[in-house]
């Protein structure tokens, strides 16, 4: 086991604070409408230019082990805030730096760090409650666009395209961000349910131009096993043929003579059918088949529930207004499912999201909700160069997370104003303990730091602006983008309450742990001797 370097007291705390400051100073320059870029060197390809706090934080590793521990703890603040709210990482970092800097003064002066932390926690709890009270719902498309614009560093185009996407697919819909092919941002919307399985044979194509199989007013047969014997299918096919309507078959697989017969019937025009594989695998496949059944008003034919394919009737089949099947995707538009049943299914999946432990499971469940409740929108980010594309994509993703957070918990005045106004909740907060009261004072001062940094990045004088904002009331604040004072919400400078709340909670949590640290242990790097020179090769014998 390698030897350890153990350090105590003020000396080690100072090193930790140095690490915090190095990371926070790199991140804080990106805050606000006039925040600057950070350029990050990459081992492969061109440099990465970003204004995203968490991206900058993730790149920082320091040589000194103790400084690096401080930096990594603040990195955790940014990452956690990003995981919960998807934005606000720079605000969280600035708050953490401020709480640590203020708190260390009190610790050095001999106050009890544990009581300071308790005071900080009580102050944060009061602020969070106040933020919830002052938050207003974010319902209109205009407000959603404003939140998106602010998060994307005042890029109004980004805000507008996100608002349009949310309008098209609903607030629960899936919105993804991809690289575009042109210079402009584009929005593609897939209405209805889409899953990533295409036709099993190109002979099913009936629209040669689009290379898709389009079915109008079709029946939908859902089966959870393989179909290889055409005899099992014949009774259903005959009933569908009598009804003179097309049929989509979704099964684990369709192969052999069953597939061949369907193709021949299709080519001859006897019966318009298309076969596709069921989406997903294992239990997820069963769940998705059930989703499709509820969406189309059909039943999954499964031997597990005593249903067999040869006894299936038209009542067991789902129906839809139109279904389009491409090489890799199938889209069901306007299923005939019962709205109440669809809502109940969505509520059931939401319940599963609450209890899911892995991010992957949550993401897949969220996709299922979106496919049932709304649709899928794809924002294609356009840019002139690859470097610009990456930077723009970062901002669009941030803005998307921010708008989702705004819809969830409402919005508050942006530009650091909400935190200043929430301080009213601390005026009458007395803990009955001098050291805990000092913890409350630490938070009182720290909540000014985001506004101070926004003003500093815009080239203003932070103290002057903070005093002027404190003289006002309600949503009165400073718009660093235009240099004006006024009602922040009317000027469209909004922050999601969830982002502000998460930033404050995570910053205080990690900063509190730092203040109560009195010993740090790091490995002493071993000085490995250099590799010895390789011996020379022996001389070759004389050649004949």
UniProtKB/Swiss-Prot annotation:
It is an enzyme of class 5 (isomerase). Its EC number is 5.6.1.7. Gene3D superfamilies: GroEL, GroEL-like equatorial domain, TCP-1-like chaperonin intermediate domain. It holds the Pfam family Cpn60_TCP1. InterPro entries: Chaperonin_Cpn60_CS, Cpn60/GroEL, Cpn60/GroEL/TCP-1, GroEL-like_apical_dom_sf, GROEL-like_equatorial_sf, TCP-1-like_intermed_sf. Its main location: cytoplasm. GO terms for molecular function: ATP binding; ATP-dependent protein folding chaperone; isomerase activity; unfolded protein binding. Signal peptide: none annotated. It is found in: Cytoplasm. Belongs to the chaperonin (HSP60) family. It catalyses: ATP + H2O + a folded polypeptide = ADP + phosphate + an unfolded polypeptide. One of its GO terms (biological process) is protein refolding. It comes from Neisseria meningitidis serogroup C / serotype 2a (strain ATCC 700532 / DSM 15464 / FAM18). ATP binds at residues 30-33, 51, 87-91, 415, 495. The keyword ATP-binding applies. Together with its co-chaperonin GroES, plays an essential role in assisting protein folding. The GroEL-GroES system forms a nano-cage that allows encapsulation of the non-native substrate proteins and provides a physical environment optimized to promote and accelerate protein folding. This is Chaperonin GroEL. Keywords: ATP-binding, Chaperone, Cytoplasm, Isomerase, Nucleotide-binding. One of its GO terms (cellular component) is cytoplasm. Forms a cylinder of 14 subunits composed of two heptameric rings stacked back-to-back. Interacts with the co-chaperonin GroES. The keyword Cytoplasm applies. PROSITE patterns: CHAPERONINS_CPN60.
């Amino acid at each position: 086991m390698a030897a350890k370097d153990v350090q105590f007291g003020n000396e080690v705390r100072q090193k930790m604070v140095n690490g915090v400051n190095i990371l926070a100073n790199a991140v804080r320059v990106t805050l606000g409408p006039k925040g600057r870029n950070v350029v990050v060197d990459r081992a492969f390809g061109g440099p990465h230019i970003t204004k995203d706090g968490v991206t900058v934080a993730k790149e920082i590793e320091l040589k000194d082990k103790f400084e690096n521990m401080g930096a990594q703890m603040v990195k955790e603040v940014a990452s956690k805030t990003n995981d919960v709210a998807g934005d606000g990482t720079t605000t969280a970092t600035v708050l953490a730096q401020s709480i640590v800097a203020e708190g260390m003064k009190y610790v050095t002066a001999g106050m009890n760090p544990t009581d300071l932390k308790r005071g900080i926690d009580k102050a944060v709890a009061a602020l969070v409650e106040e933020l919830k009270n002052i938050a207003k719902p974010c319902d209109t498309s205009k407000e959603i666009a404003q939140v998106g614009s602010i998060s994307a560093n005042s890029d109004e185009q980004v805000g507008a395209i996100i608002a349009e996407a949310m309008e098209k697919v609903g607030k629960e819909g899936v919105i993804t961000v991809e690289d575009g092919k042109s210079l402009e941002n584009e929005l593609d919307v897939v209405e209805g349910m889409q899953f990533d399985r295409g036709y099993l044979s190109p002979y099913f194509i009936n629209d040669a131009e689009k290379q898709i199989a389009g079915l109008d007013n079709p029946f939908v047969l859902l089966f959870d096993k393989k179909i290889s014997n055409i005899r099992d299918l014949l009774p259903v096919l005959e009933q569908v043929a009598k009804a003179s309507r097309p049929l989509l078959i979704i099964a684990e697989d369709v192969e052999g003579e069953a597939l061949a017969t369907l193709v021949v019937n299709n080519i001859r025009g006897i019966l318009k059918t298309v076969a596709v594989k069921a989406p997903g695998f294992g239990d997820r496949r069963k769940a998705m088949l059930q989703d499709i059944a509820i969406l189309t008003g059909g039943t999954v034919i499964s031997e597990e529930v005593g249903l067999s394919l040869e006894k299936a009737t038209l009542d067991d089949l789902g129906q839809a207004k139109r279904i389009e099947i491409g090489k890799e995707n199938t889209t069901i538009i306007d299923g005939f499912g019962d709205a109440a049943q669809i809502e109940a299914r969505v509520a059931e999946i939401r319940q599963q999201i609450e209890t899911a432990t892995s991010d992957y499971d949550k993401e897949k469940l969220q996709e299922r909700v979106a496919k049932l409740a709304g649709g899928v929108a794809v924002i294609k980010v356009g840019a002139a160069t690859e470097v610009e594309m990456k930077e723009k994509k970062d901002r669009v993703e941030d803005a998307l997370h921010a708008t989702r957070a705004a819809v969830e918990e409402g919005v508050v005045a942006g530009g650091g104003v909400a935190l200043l106004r929430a301080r009213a909740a601390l005026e009458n907060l007395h803990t009955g303990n001098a050291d805990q009261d000092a913890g409350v004072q630490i938070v009182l001062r720290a909540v000014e730091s985001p506004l101070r940094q926004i003003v500093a990045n815009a080239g203003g004088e932070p103290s002057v602006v903070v005093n002027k904002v404190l003289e006002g009331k309600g949503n009165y604040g400073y718009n660093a983008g235009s240099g004006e004072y006024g009602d922040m919400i009317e000027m469209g400078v909004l922050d999601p309450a969830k982002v502000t709340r998460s930033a404050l909670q995570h910053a205080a949590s990690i900063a509190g742990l730092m203040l109560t640290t009195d010993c740090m242990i790091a490995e002493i790097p071993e000085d490995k001797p250099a590799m010895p020179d390789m011996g020379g090769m022996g001389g070759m014998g004389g050649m004949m």
